[in-house]
C-alpha cells in the first residue's frame, strides 16, 4: 500500500501501543503464562450463551434503542436500587454502552471543554488521560504512593481551581487493588459541594471487594450521585470481557449530554447480548457471589507465593495483585516484566506504565482471574526465581 502523501499532525503524539497489548503480545510470542492483561481464562456459564442464542434465533438482531434495551436498563435499575438504595430512571438516567472504556470516554468528551482541568489519581487506567486530551482538557495528576495508595485529601483540595471541570475516580482501583471508603466519598462530596465539578466514578470492579468490606459507590451517596457518572462493566462481572458491554448511571441532566455524544460514537450496543444479560441478571447471586469467588482466587494466589521472594501488597478488591520484587532484581519494572516473560515464562504489568512520569517503585501487577491450574503453574515458575 502506498504511504500517506502528507505530514500528519497526531492528536495524541505521545501515545503509543498500550502496555497491556505489548505484554500480552510478548507473552504469546514467548509462550508465557499471561498474568498481565486483566481477563479470565475461564468461560461464563452456558446458560448465558444459551440466552444469547435464544434471542438471536427469535429474531432480535436489529438495532436496539440508542440508550439500550429497556429490559436491560430496567434490570440495571433494579440491581442498583437494591444494592445502593438509589432509584435511577431507566428511561433517562441509564445508558448501556460498548464497554466501560467507551462510557468513560463519552462522559469526558460530553462534558470537558478546551481549557478545563480534570483531576486524575495516578497510577491511573490508561484511557483516562487520552480522553481528556482529545476533549481539549488538561489532566491534573495526583499521585497515590505505595504501599497503601490512599488519596491525600489536602492535595486534592489544593488541586481544585476555578478551571476544574471533573474529577475521575476508580474504586475498587486498578492497578493497586485498593478501595475507597464511605469516608473518602464524604471528603470528595465536601470538596465538590457548591461547585459545578462533575465526578466520573469508574466502578467496574464494584462486585469484587474482599474480607467482608462493602463497595462504597457514588450511586449510594446521594450528594455525589447528583453530580456523578457511575460506570460499570458486565465484562468484569460475568467473565465476558470480549463482549464489551457496560453501562453508565447519571442524573438526567448529565445523561442528556452523555447521550448526545453516545449516539454518534457507537449509537447502540449488540441487541441479543443485551436481552440475554437482562435475563441473566435476574439471579442476583451471579453478582453478589462474585466477591467470594475472586477472594478464593486471591487467597490461593497469595498463599502460593507466600514463600517466594516477592513481597505482596494488600489486595482489597479487583482481581489484581501488586508485588514488590526488590529482593529479586535491581532492574526497572518494565525491564523486569520483560525478563519475567522471556526467561521465567510469566507475564506481568509494570506499574510505572500507570504514571505519566514513569515513576518506578519496583512494583508489578499480576492478574489472578485465572483457573487454579493456571495460577499453580505460574506460581511454580515465580517461586523458582
Identify what each model region corresponds to.
Residues 278, 294-302, 312-325, 359:
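Conserved glycine-rich beta-strand-loop-beta hairpin in the small C-terminal domain of fold type I
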Residues 78, 339-348, 354-385:
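PLP-dependent enzyme catalytic core of the Aspartate aminotransferase-like
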Residues 110-132:
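Conserved PLP-anchoring active-site segment centered on the Schiff-base-forming lysine
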Residues 30, 135, 194-195, 308, ...:
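Helix C-cap/helix->beta junction micro-motif
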Residues 140, 144-211:
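Active-site phosphate-binding strand-loop segment of PLP-dependent enzymes
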Residues 220, 226-295, 299-305, 385:
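Conserved core segment of the aminotransferase class I/II
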Residues 2-4, 9-99, 106, 280-282:
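N-terminal small-domain helix-loop-helix segment of the aminotransferase-like
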Residues 134-140:
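A short helix-loop-beta submotif of the ANL/AMP-binding
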